[in-house]
């Protein structure tokens, strides 16, 4: 039997689609969907119900209805692309410069959902081909909300992976300043001012947070530290990936570096400022390879990496650095150590380390957490000095380390 004969054989078509559908149901793990096999059987064999009710069956020689044909094509495209986006791969746009020079602002990525396993939509009532906004309004309804669930993928997140994820603080958004972190604005100016000036406030489901793209530098169970800009994982210096860049002060002999040289290095000329008083460039973002090229320029006198030490140049900079407490005395270049929680692991809690895990316990793992005036920690009504985590966590950094 030829392929053409198989295509026109209704039993062969029914068997083919039934096998594919059955494999999908097994992967999905929701066996109520097995009733869909009855739909496939009826559509191909018994034809008791016209499942594609919008699609007209034409008699031989009958003129086709262009409107119905377009409707059929649109419905097919919406269903097919939505299915592909949920379970297989999806296009994303780089929203910021935090990954330069590895990934540039405005770059489009096709991200595989199969690698880590696709996440089942928690908010299924969404306008197709939108994420969270359309025409300045939210593009979804929260009438139906599902629990977080991810299907099995080929592997887990590994150190060094580029990862697209929902911005952790993106559950709350100021409508007049959606690109600004609500919690950071509140820390700087107070909640009342933030809401009055930039509100109203929108609360978004977990799968409708804005997408961010970063590199995973630490996985669950790791202890992360940054010492003078060098990342350490479990006390071992981490590999510096080719795209990672820091900010340097470049002093010249009074002349500017050739523009063609700067463009060849991939630097954004419009963002580089030359200071005649230095003389040179007060801030120049460079990777290791770019640093070598700049040092080789004949008119460059010195190149010095900018390393934030404590106390920082800006006294309130801790308000932008997790865990947002001045008592930690951390900076972006001298940070930690911080232990990354993993499922099943228990951590001892006290008032000193509680800020590191408070949001995880309260928001991500949905517990009631309170602290008494005397400093006692109460979780779900019980006084405790420890907590066992339910999920694995990861630590992300942008490759553009001083602008991320």
Feature roles, as predicted:
Residues 1-404:
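Extended hydrophobic leader/signal-anchor segments used for secretion and membrane insertion
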